[in-house]
Regions:
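Hydrophobic, well-ordered secondary-structure elements that form the walls
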Residues: 401, 462, 590
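Mixed-charge, glycine-rich, non-catalytic linkers/tails in nucleic-acid processing enzymes
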Residues: 604-614
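Mg2+-dependent endonuclease catalytic cores in nucleic-acid-processing enzymes, primarily RNase H-like
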Residues: 114-118, 122, 265, 269-278, ...
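Phosphate/NTP-binding elements of NTP-utilizing enzymes
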Residues: 2-400, 407, 439-460, 479-481
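A generic structural motif
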Residues: 149, 412-414
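Short connector loops/turns at beta-strand edges and beta->alpha or beta->beta junctions
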Residues: 95-96, 414-417
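Extracellular low-complexity, Gly/Ser/Thr-rich intrinsically disordered linkers
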Residues: 322, 326, 334-338, 358, ...
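Anionic group-transfer/hydrolysis microenvironments
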Residues: 180-181, 403, 412, 467
Length: 641
């Protein structure tokens, strides 16, 4: 029987096609695959180029990619590459292990941005992934902002974490959460995000849940809660280059005999003091090649996340659930000098101190519950203003609080570093929906204030609360005075939410209804109340009050300090909430709204308070130097001598 060459070639083609479905690549760990394939795109990386796993990332990534570890929690600071690790492991799951994957981010906007700036460029820059994406760069049902379906049949979803519907109808092998601490505690009264999300992997042969976040407030932080449910909490231990003793790096403080130490006011002098033998260690001396993660609860350890050992050194099965902690001191993307500089910037500012603890140390912040400023002490902090608008004020904003029988407005002046001065207090009595009352509010909005040189300043931006009244009243006033000048607002009591989140588009009522992070604003304001100016020296963040009983008195001070943080159980969860205890707090609310108006001006219109003040002072100087004929006559007659 003769077979032609063309028949042989056709047979070879069909045999290969039939066997192709049986082909499996040689197994690789997540780190092996990432080092061989992963590429950091220019859109979402400080430095574009091929991925190279760092020593402290090795065990974390391999644990994420392991089929034997069901839950991985990562409690971390900023600048350790968590999102990049997560995305690299997801690419590994899709291309190498052929798994269905899903990741949630705190909001729909976060998810959309992550898909555009991280996921899509990563698909483009990894050839093996791009080969599975014939739809790349095209409109296609398998290529949307929430889902990518690859030609190997595997799907990847990227969704916001606020809506309960985003936790339904998906059957995946891998569920991931980026910045878990920023998620709502209870998703539309249906449960915690990890409880809802992990339901999506219950039918998988190899279920995997990956959670990571910079932590927030102790006792209410979701990544802290997830970590506490894991039996293993791993910290990265490195040997001292001088005595050889292992330890994990600690920031330390004045009372701690080890950790980062430096000469006062000289960050460049920083070194690490070994906790075992007081050896002086410089950052460049540490070698992380053989460093290992050790559990502070059980003593088990691993170097690579593949092989695990008991505290006595015997090899054991990988744990079902594990938590890793890593912080900035280990990162080559930062320096110990910069850590010290950042720490020094937090002096006297509790808000900055909390940010440092969360984002640099990767630790939860322990809130001081029940403390509030002393109103009587604050009431004595009156100052003589040189004019209705003090010299260092560059910009005026106002906040309006709505009540059924009145409107209350406070005008605040702002200088460089957000130093602030209370400029005016207006209480407009009358029915909230009466036009005559609203006309008097109009007058207050359009009132001008005088600088020392006689120049008039108007209120540049006003945030007006819609709570408790018909919001269309505020909407119409916004249209009357200017959509960008009078901005309707509503409060959002969510920890960590920006002071102001102004939308890019108008709502269906034709206005820019803006959410205010009231908790964040109040915390910042209370921190600033602790700053005490010395004489007339500028002090960023300091708050000033006029020696004018029509504007500032004990009642105003009491309202500014009316609220305190309290612990409450809400739907079975402990939360830290701001509570006025039924004390009047209109002055504080107005301050919050005025601060929000300033932040909108900075974020949306790039307001630069320092540059604006310099410009105003030039105008003040020019006005001061202008002389009238009468001035010259007095000078010539000797009257000015």
């Amino acid at each position: 029987m003769n077979i032609s060459n063309s028949q042989v070639n056709r047979l070879r083609h069909f045999v290969r096609a039939g066997l192709r479905s049986l082909f499996r690549p040689e197994p690789q760990t997540a780190v092996e695959w990432a080092d061989a394939n992963y590429y950091l795109p220019k859109e979402s990386a400080y430095q574009e180029g091929r991925w190279e796993t760092l020593p402290f990332q090795r065990a974390i990534m391999n644990a994420m990619g392991s089929d034997y570890i069901r839950e991985v929690n990562v409690v971390k600071s900023a600048r350790v590459g968590y999102s990049k690790m997560l995305l690299g492991v997801y690419a590994y799951f899709i291309e190498h292990k052929q798994r269905n994957t899903l990741i949630w981010l705190p909001t729909d906007g976060d998810a959309e941005n992550f898909m555009k700036t991280h996921v899509e460029p990563t698909i483009r820059d990894i050839p093996s992934l791009l080969a599975l994406a014939p739809w790349y760069g095209k409109k296609h049902r398998d290529n949307t902002l929430t889902m990518k379906r690859f030609s190997n049949g595997r799907g990847f979803w990227c969704l916001g974490g606020k809506a309960a519907k985003n936790y339904r109808e998906k059957s995946v092998d891998v569920a991931g959460y980026d910045e878990l601490a920023a998620f709502d505690d209870d998703i539309e009264q249906e449960g915690s995000p990890t409880f809802l999300g992990d339901k999506r992997i219950e039918g998988s042969v190899w279920p995997k849940s990956i959670r990571g976040s910079t932590p927030k407030v102790r006792g209410t932080c979701q990544i802290e809660r997830a970590a506490s449910e894991s039996p293993h909490f791993m910290r990265f231990h490195v040997a001292c280059p001088h005595c050889g003793e292992e330890q994990y790096l600690k920031f330390g403080d004045k009372e701690t005999p080890f950790g980062l130490k430096w000469t006062p006011d000289d960050p460049s002098s920083v070194f690490y003091l070994c906790e075992h033998n007081a050896c002086v260690i410089r950052q460049q001396e540490l070698d992380f090649t053989d460093a290992r993660y050790i559990c502070e609860k059980t003593g088990i350890w691993t170097r690579d996340g593949i092989l695990w050992f008991s505290s006595s050194g015997e090899e054991i099965e990988p744990p079902d659930s594990v938590t890793f902690h890593i912080w900035t001191a280990y990162s080559p993307f930062s320096t110990w000098v910069q850590i010290v500089k950042d720490w020094m910037k937090t002096k006297g500012d509790t808000g900055k101190r909390k940010t440092f603890v969360n984002t640099t140390l990767g630790e939860t912040w322990e809130a001081k519950i029940g403390e509030r400023p002393d109103a009587e002490v604050m009431a004595e902090r009156k100052e003589h203003y040189s004019a209705p608008v003090p010299d260092r004020v560059a910009y005026l904003t106002a906040g309006i609080d709505s009540q059924l029988d009145r409107y209350e407005m406070r005008v605040w002046g702002w200088g460089p570093g957000e130093e602030s001065w209370l400029i005016d207090r207006q209480i407009i009595m009358g029915r909230h929906d009466d036009e005559q009352t609203l006309l008097r509010v109009d007058e207050a909005i359009n009132k001008t204030y005088t600088r020392r040189n006689g120049a008039e300043m108007s209120i540049s931006r006003i945030c007006w609360d819609i709570g408790g009244i018909d919001p269309t009243i505020v909407y119409e006033r916004s249209k009357k005075h200017g959509l960008f000048r009078v901005i309707p607002i509503k409060g959002a009591s969510v920890y960590g939410k920006p002071v102001a989140s102004m939308p890019r588009k108008r709502n269906k009522n034709g206005v820019y209804l803006t959410e205010i992070g009231t908790d964040t604003a109040k915390e910042q304001i209370y921190n600033r109340f602790t700053l005490t100016p010395e004489g007339d020296e500028p002090l960023p963040g300091a708050v000033h009050f006029p020696n004018n009983p029509d504007i500032f008195d004990l009642t105003e001070a009491q309202q500014l300090t009316a609220e305190e943080q309290v612990e409450k159980w809400v739907d079975g969860r402990k939360k830290i909430l701001w509570d006025s205890k039924k004390r009047r707090n209109e002055a504080l609310d107005c301050f919050v709204y005025a601060l929000a108006a300033l932040r909108i001006s900075i974020s949306r219109w790039q307001l630069d308070l320092s540059a604006l003040l310099a410009s105003l002072q030039e105008e003040d100087g020019a006005a001061t130097n202008k002389k009238t004929l009468a001035d010259y006559a007095r000078a010539l007659s000797g009257e000015d001598e």
